[in-house]
Regions:
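ABC transporter nucleotide-binding domains
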Residues: 5-7, 12-205, 210
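ABC-family P-loop ATPase nucleotide-binding domain
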Residues: 1-11, 299-303
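A broad structural signal for alpha-helix termini and local helix breaks/kinks
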Residues: 14, 102-105, 221, 244, ...
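Short, charged/small-residue-rich alpha-helical element at the C-terminal edge
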Residues: 223-299, 303
Length: 303
């Protein structure tokens, strides 16, 4: 089985912008793959090439072993993409929208079965413009699934949704992966990427600057977990700095911050005991993908 996606030294240049610059990326099938990066980093340009809407200036891209431009008609029957809200007629019923879109394909699934899979069977007779934001997003997922594609592209699928709606969509994406599909997910939510994605590529300024599993990226690029506490006495920093795995110690008056990798907290506690200092208001925050992105780019993803 070929990779779901291959970018082979692909670049896309515009007169004054290198939107994609020498992209090399292989995405294996049957996983949720996250594509992260700030606005303007080149994600949309890359997605357009993968969907056959544009072609690289140099290099090549392959999707399911096909050339997205040359083989676009064949590819469209095998991939599903998320529509934007303006592309759906609001005064149609949900079942009518799915039936209409299903008619565009030589083979499509039963609309009610698809609605059942996204938890919207009870809304089949509802008008699209009467649905909640989370329900409309599930309609868009159903439309992407109507022809039973192997590969799915979703762009900011849960942005602006309430937590309950977001969790429902996360469950749907997990079900799609369990059913053997490949999902390409672009998101600004580091929590979403860390929770859902098997592998992640981080883009910035037209380049892929890191790629791996969430744990691999955190282990390689994040400074580590952050331990914060306050003290009533004086803490000598040198013994804390010598603890294996500790990468940073910052003491501001009574507030102490220790950053490190591995299980360094018990050793910090021992140092405090040896110095006859009792910590208070202690909190431990594990390293996250947000820390990785900040380390790699010097800014948060929301910036």
């Amino acid at each position: 089985m070929p990779p779901a996606i291959q970018c082979l030294d692909s670049s896309r240049y515009f007169p004054k912008v290198k939107a994609n610059d020498h992209i090399n990326l292989t995405i294996e099938p049957h996983q949720i793959f996250g594509l992260l990066g700030p606005n303007g980093c080149g994600k949309t340009t890359l997605l357009h090439q993968l969907q056959g809407l544009d072609a690289p200036t140099s290099g090549a891209v392959k999707v399911l072993g096909l050339d997205p431009r040359r083989d676009r008609q064949e590819l469209m029957a095998r991939i599903g993409t998320q529509l934007q809200e303006a592309q759906v007629i609001p005064r149609l019923k949900v079942i009518e929208v799915l039936t209409t879109f299903g008619s565009f394909y030589p083979q499509s699934q039963d609309p009610m079965m698809v609605l059942e899979s996204v938890g919207l069977a009870a809304k089949a007779g509802a008008f699209v413009d009467k649905l909640s934001g989370g329900q409309r997003q599930r309609v868009f997922i159903a439309l992407a699934l109507i022809h039973n594609p192997e590969l799915l592209f979703f762009d900011e699928l849960t942005s602006a949704l309430d937590p309950q709606s977001r969790l429902k969509i996360w469950d749907i994406l997990r079900d799609l992966k369990a059913a053997g599909r490949t999902v390409i997910l672009t998101t600004h939510s580091m929590e979403e990427a860390q929770t859902l994605c098997d592998r992640i590529a981080i883009m910035d300024a037209g380049h892929i600057i890191a790629e791996g599993t969430p744990d691999e990226l955190i282990d390689e690029f994040a400074q580590g977990s952050t331990l914060k506490f306050s003290v009533s006495g004086t803490v000598q920093p040198a013994p804390l700095e010598k603890i294996s795995g500790v990468t940073s110690v910052d003491i501001q008056g009574q507030d102490v911050t220790v950053i490190g990798k591995g299980d360094f907290t018990p050793h910090v506690m021992q140092v405090l005991t040896d110095q006859h200092v009792s910590p208070a208001h202690m909190s431990l925050n594990p390293a996250t993908l947000e820390d990785v992105f900040l380390h790699l780019t010097g800014r948060s993803l929301q910036a």
